Amino acid sequence: MTATTPCLWARAPGARKLGIPGETRGNVFFGIDYLVDPSSVAIGQSVAVIGAGNVAMDVARAALRQGARNVTIYARSKHVSASSDEVEFDQLDGAELVYGKAVQEIDDNGPVLRTAIFDEEGAVVGYEDELDHVSCDTVVIAASQQAKDKLVLTTDALVANDRGLLEGGARTA
């Protein structure tokens, strides 16, 4: 006799909002939504991508393939969560990756960023006071996702963390 293990698949198709001023402007999109149908967005020539995961890398390549000439990916830390292959493909396609930039708001011209201060181990310990104003046609926020699945949101036995991801327990296989 073999034991069976139930498996629950819950998708996280919802964009995670940053809660910053300007993220609802007409030229600001969320990565997961943009990737559903990139051709439905007039992306422009210059694109700022906020985030450094695989979705951010996919957004950058989609924007370049859609005709954007300047695509810059902004990462808060010195590390990215995207796979090294994704990063390499983006750079080969012409995207620029800028480390140590945290978005504070999005104004009429584009994202307003602060530069990170790193300790000896490369961890962010603070931010410089000076703000960097980036001018671009389009901003795409690709800084994580959250659960948008009704099952996860309405079932008490399923516990999600602050990012909307399911928490595992002792009985989780």
Give the ranges of each region predicted by the language model.
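Feature captures the FAD/FMN-dependent oxidoreductase FAD-binding
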Residues: 1-20, 104-112, 138-140, 146-148
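Glycine/threonine-rich flexible loop motifs
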Residues: 17-22, 126, 150-155
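Short gly/ser/thr-rich secondary-structure transition/capping motifs
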Residues: 27-34, 119-126, 161-166
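Short acidic, glycine/proline-enriched helix-loop-strand junctions
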Residues: 23-27, 42, 80-96
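A conserved beta-strand/loop element that lines the FAD pocket in flavoprotein oxidoreductases
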Residues: 1, 94-102
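Rossmann-like dinucleotide/flavin-binding elements
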Residues: 14, 33-84, 132-133, 138, ...
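Conserved beta-strand-loop-beta-strand element in the redox core of flavoprotein oxidoreductases
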Residues: 1-7, 25, 107-133
